[in-house]
Swiss-Prot record:
Keywords: Hydrolase, Membrane, Protease, RNA-binding, Serine protease, Signal, Transmembrane, Transmembrane helix. The record marks 204-205, 399-400 as: Cleavage. Its EC number is 3.4.21.-. The chain crosses the membrane at residues 121-141, 144-164, 172-192. It comes from Potato leafroll virus (strain Potato/Netherlands/Wageningen/1989). It comes from the Viruses. This is Protein P1. Residues 1-20 form the signal peptide. Precursor from which the VPg molecule is probably released at the onset of the RNA synthesis. Essential for virus replication. GO terms for molecular function: RNA binding; serine-type endopeptidase activity; serine-type exopeptidase activity. Gene3D superfamilies: Trypsin-like serine proteases. The C-terminus part of VPg/P1-C25 displays RNA-binding properties. Residues 456-510, 542-639 are annotated as: Disordered. Belongs to the peptidase S39B family.
Length: 639
């Protein structure tokens, strides 16, 4: 029954639609269009659909009659149902849009109100915390101020007592931390040093079974010097080395320093070792490195040699130098191995050899200590130079090849370096009882006193001394100016020998460098330079050289040089104002007194005759003792 009813209803609706279509209720001239969601949101709430007229269905312009719109009842059920559905959809959309708009406005207003209330609550809370905190500090400050104002003396006493109590507490805490360790380690250190460190050594011996040899030979760079007692008797030796800091120093055994004088065989000067400042000293290893007073290398005529530190010493042959009957002798030796913190050396030594250096080629390995008094120790021992960064080794670490036959182990090298660094720090922290160190005592230095006195009376005397020095020829002044050695600590060095005809005053010889004097000299020298004259002479000389014919180089002839100078001799004015040097005669004449210096004059040949002068004003006989064929005498006069 229900199925029949449904079929009947569908048939009825279909028949109505088809009847209306056939009857002409749906005219093709128009269609229905509903409003969209955007038109509803924009405010267009028209429910009825608007017809869309087709362009071809519009009435002709000639037809003036208009047909009235069809009635709603004349439409078909399909059109009515479509219009009803469109109307319901538009009304639902309108109601939904209005509801969503009202809900969003309400939510936005609620969010703003909640946000405003939260910000106000947070601000009130923060200001409450600030007020409470500031109130506590303000109250505390007022109480402290009131207390200090009322009880000033009592408050000051309490503050002082609090500071003292704090210091006492910190001192007691530090003492309680370090005192047990100190009390426990001190006896162990004493026992260790008594058992192992204080070994008995004797200062020289000949090794049984070792056959060495000796040859006359001077030390490299004259770096080995003799140490003497005050009465001039022999004491030992010291060695000059070049440190990594750039200065020279003396290395010797520590037991050779007391009452010793460094003596030079070349110059004969003596410098007491008490004037040397130790930068490293070790009584346990029996070695000292000392830096001397100013110009001590020149007084002793020594140069700094290279050396090898303890971590790079290997086994192999070596040599050492001694002084026998006023001549240096080189003796053979062999580096054998290690003996605790020393190096065992096979060599034959005798009394007075202490401090002499053992050399490998031109490198110093160490200094002689002596030999141990232990059983089965048939060798001498050598004190080595430890590696001290910045002094005996560079401050940086670099990679190098391993030493073949290395003497010391890594543990021994580290122990030597640790002891050396502690000794250097101890010397750096050293302060004498008077509060002054050797390097800071300028007032007792006689050289400093002479320099200070010469610096006070500089202005008037320096100009006259400068003029006189400029007028003196360099060769003459080199022969006549021999500076005297100043006394050192009350012991004067032997005076230098001169010919007695020195034209330069004493103050000019030992005048210290002063800024004002140098400025005055430079100003005077620059003022005397005539640049225009120099330019003219240069141009003339260059033009004459350019116009001169090239010389023919005749090779294979022996004898004198056949040169002809067609140019007239021109005397150019020296910048320093000194007159032109006179030509030195080539014939042998009376030899002058040799200057008191160990350094030869610059540009001076050690042997043979001097070169011919560039311009010879008159002919002279050439030197008779020259080798080769003697040419005929020729005249050479001025052009």
């Amino acid at each position: 029954m229900n199925r029949f009813t449904a079929y009947a209803a569908l048939f009825f609706i279909f028949s109505l639609c088809s009847t209306a279509k056939e009857a002409g209720f749906q005219h093709p001239a128009f269609n229905f269009r509903g409003t969209s969601t955007m038109s509803a949101l924009s405010g267009d709430y028209s429910a009825a659909p608007t017809p869309l007229y087709k362009s071809w269905a519009l009435p002709s312009s000639l037809n003036l009659t208009t047909q009235p719109p069809p009635l709603l009842t004349d439409r078909s059920y399909y059109e009515l149902v479509q219009a009803l559905i469109s109307k319901m959809r538009l009304d639902c959309q309108t109601v939904g849009d209005m509801t969503w708009r009202h809900l969003s406005e309400m939510l936005f207003a609620s969010w703003n109100s909640v946000k405003e209330v939260s910000l106000k609550a947070a601000s009130v809370t923060l200001w409450a915390i600030i007020s409470i905190w500031f109130g506590l500090y303000w109250t505390l400050a007022r109480l402290i101020t009131l207390f200090l104002w009322t009880f000033s003396i009592e408050a000051l006493c309490l503050i002082l007592l609090g500071c003292i109590t704090s210091l006492i507490y910190k001192g007691a805490l530090s003492l309680s931390e370090h005192l047990p360790v100190f009390l426990f380690m001190s006896p162990l250190k004493i026992i260790w040093r008594a058992a192992f460190s204080k070994r008995n050594y004797k200062n020289e011996k000949a090794v049984e079974g070792y056959k060495g040899f000796s040859v006359p030979q001077k030390p490299p760079k004259s770096a080995v010097i003799e140490l003497q007692h005050e009465n001039g008797s022999h004491l030992g030796y010291a060695n000059c080395i070049r440190l990594y800091s750039g200065e020279n120093a003396l290395v010797t055994a520590e037991h050779c320093l007391e009452g010793a004088f460094a003596t030079s065989l070349k110059t004969g000067n003596r410098i007491p070792m008490s004037t040397f400042f130790p930068i490293f000293k070790s009584a346990r290893n029996d070695i000292s490195i000392l830096v001397g007073p100013p110009n001590w290398e020149g007084l002793l005529s020594v140069k700094g040699a290279h050396f090898i530190t303890a971590d790079k010493i290997g086994k192999g042959p070596a040599s050492f130098y001694t002084l026998e009957k006023g001549e240096w002798m080189c003796h053979s030796a062999t580096i054998d191995g290690a003996h605790h913190q020393f190096v065992s050396v096979l060599c034959n030594t005798g009394p007075g050899y202490s401090g002499t250096g053992f050399w490998s080629s031109k490198n110093l390995l160490g200094v002689l200590k002596g030999f141990p008094l232990e059983e089965e120790c048939n060798y001498n021992v050598m004190s080595v130079i430890p590696s001290i960064p910045g002094i005996t080794s560079p401050n940086y670490v670099f990679e190098s090849t391993a030493v073949k036959g290395r003497v010391f182990s890594d543990e021994t090298v580290k122990e030597l370096e640790r002891e050396a660094s502690e000794a250097v720090k101890k010397l750096a922290r050293f302060k004498s009882l008077t509060g002054k160190n050797w390097a800071n005592d300028y007032d007792s230095d006689e050289d400093y006193g002479l320099e200070k006195e010469a610096a006070t009376n500089a202005p008037a005397e320096k100009t006259a001394q400068t003029n006189s020095a400029e007028k003196t020829a360099p060769s003459t002044s080199a022969e006549k100016t021999a500076p005297t050695n100043k006394p050192l600590n009350g012991r004067a060095a032997p005076p230098a020998k001169t010919n007695g005809n020195s034209d330069i005053p004493d103050a000019a010889i030992s005048a210290p460098p002063m800024d004002k004097m140098v400025e005055q000299i430079i100003t005077a020298m620059v003022g005397r330079i005539n640049l225009s004259e120099i330019e003219e002479k240069i141009v003339s000389r260059v033009s004459q050289k350019a116009l001169q014919k090239p010389k023919q180089n005749k090779r294979g002839r022996r004898g004198g040089k056949n040169k002809q100078n067609n140019l007239p001799p021109t005397s150019t004015q020296s910048i320093s104002g000194a007159p032109k040097k006179k030509a030195v005669p080539q014939a042998s004449g009376s030899a002058g007194i040799s200057p008191a210096t160990t350094t030869p004059a610059p540009k001076e040949k050690p042997s043979g005759g001097k070169n011919s002068a560039k311009f010879i004003p008159s002919w002279r006989i050439k030197q008779q003792d020259s080798a080769g064929q003697k040419p005929d005498l020729k005249l050479n006069s001025k052009a």
